């Protein structure tokens, strides 16, 4: 190491000769950031993840959209490398589902799904994107405006309702759900790709750590 950063640091925060020491402080509370995991996709077999190659998770879509990802930022289907002309995003994939033991909202899914849908529209200009959601929970500064931008400026189609089943037919993914804003009317979309916004769950060991 050259040590230049230590010399030029205006606050003296860099010290290469500093030794380990134990510090004791009296505090009012301790916040431990344990992180989280995403829900195992085997949790909802009705969505067909693992059975159909073109059903992926939000994390996998993030890699596809990244310039350093496997497709160099191009949105392409895992099955054949073609650009999907119609894509469905399923928010709350596992979240807010008391029947399966996850009654809570994962909080992050609404926003990263909106971002993913916008990225898709920016990269596939003639493509169609649909988002199935339960409620829009945009809990942050300018978050609501961000979602409205996805809808009004980028043309993302939002459908308020749950997806009941996804299956493949004649090379297309059939997404069956309902639109609760239209009186729970059945909705069926033929998609080229489906992205699941899987629920966030507590990190392994977090409960044990809380007892210590």
Language-model features, listed with the residues they occupy:
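Residues forming the flavin
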Residues: 1-212
């Amino acid at each position: 190491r050259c040590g230049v950063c230590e010399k030029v640091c205006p606050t003296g925060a860099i010290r290469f000769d500093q030794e380990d020491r134990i510090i004791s402080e009296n505090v009012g509370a301790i916040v431990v950031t344990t992180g989280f995991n995403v829900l195992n996709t085997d949790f909802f077999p009705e969505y067909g993840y693992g059975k159909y190659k073109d059903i992926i998770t939000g994390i996998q879509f993030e890699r596809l959209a990244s310039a350093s990802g496997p497709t160099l930022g191009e949105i392409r289907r895992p099955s054949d490398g073609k650009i999907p002309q119609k894509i469905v995003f399923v928010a709350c994939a596992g979240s807010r589902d008391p029947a399966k033991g996850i009654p809570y909202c994962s909080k992050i899914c609404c926003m990263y799904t909106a971002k993913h849908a916008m990225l898709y529209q920016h990269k596939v200009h003639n493509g169609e994107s649909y988002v199935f959601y339960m409620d829009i929970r945009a809990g942050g500064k300018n978050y609501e405006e961000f979602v409205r931008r996805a809808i009004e400026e980028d043309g993302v189609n939002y459908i308020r309702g749950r997806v009941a089943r996804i299956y493949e037919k004649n090379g297309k993914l059939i997404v069956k759900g309902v639109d609760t804003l239209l009186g729970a009317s059945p909705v069926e979309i033929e998609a080229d790709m489906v992205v699941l916004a899987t629920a966030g769950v507590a990190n392994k060991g977090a409960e044990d750590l809380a007892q210590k």
